[in-house]
Amino acid sequence: MIQRLKKFYLDNVVPDLYQKFEYTNIHQLPYLKKIVINCGFGEASQNSKFLEGTIKDLSIIASQKPIVTRARKAIAGFQIRKKMPVGVCVTLRGETMYAFLDRLIHLALPRIKDFQGLNWKSFDGYGNFHFGIREQLIFPEIHYDKIDKIRGMNISIITSCHTDTEALHFLTSLGIPFDSRDSFSTQER
């Protein structure tokens, strides 16, 4: 079964992008490559219960089992030894990616207190968008009574766009809410 957001992309976003950017080939159209969700846990890396809780929460949110990221080298100042777990990461592609983005846009982001939209300055110059979430409680799958600690996470939306302007228009047409107080068109990128 095709995801709702993917169907919206094919039916509404593709014709809009064809008209706006005047593509000559269907392969020039921007698309979502992947979504990467990363959750680092710094000083709590010595606690195995914290690692298990983070893996459980992220697997519930992403509907996919995350991998444990480990330190490449020892850093004495941060009390990190080589191969010590320092975070968890999950990469979403295909139908799972569209399902997660649909839940993020329509269920999770509106639950953030005083949410004005995402900051459009978080583009990296190559058409990819990165932002952070302070707590996992905004996702409806996470129950407040069953968490041991509030965790934040970084979400990276990787697109095939070549410029930030193209990516902003693409992600806006998908429904991602951007902050309208500081307009993108007035700034030079």
From Swiss-Prot:
Domain of life: Eukaryota
Gene Ontology BP term (one): translation
Chief localisation class: plastid
Any one GO MF annotation of this record: structural constituent of ribosome
A GO CC term assigned to this protein in UniProt: ribosome
Family membership noted in the UniProt record: Belongs to the universal ribosomal protein uL5 family.
Subunit text: Part of the 50S ribosomal subunit; contacts the 5S rRNA.
UniProt function note: Binds 5S rRNA, forms part of the central protuberance of the 50S subunit.
Entry protein name: Large ribosomal subunit protein uL5c
Organism: Chara vulgaris
Gene from which this protein is expressed: rpl5
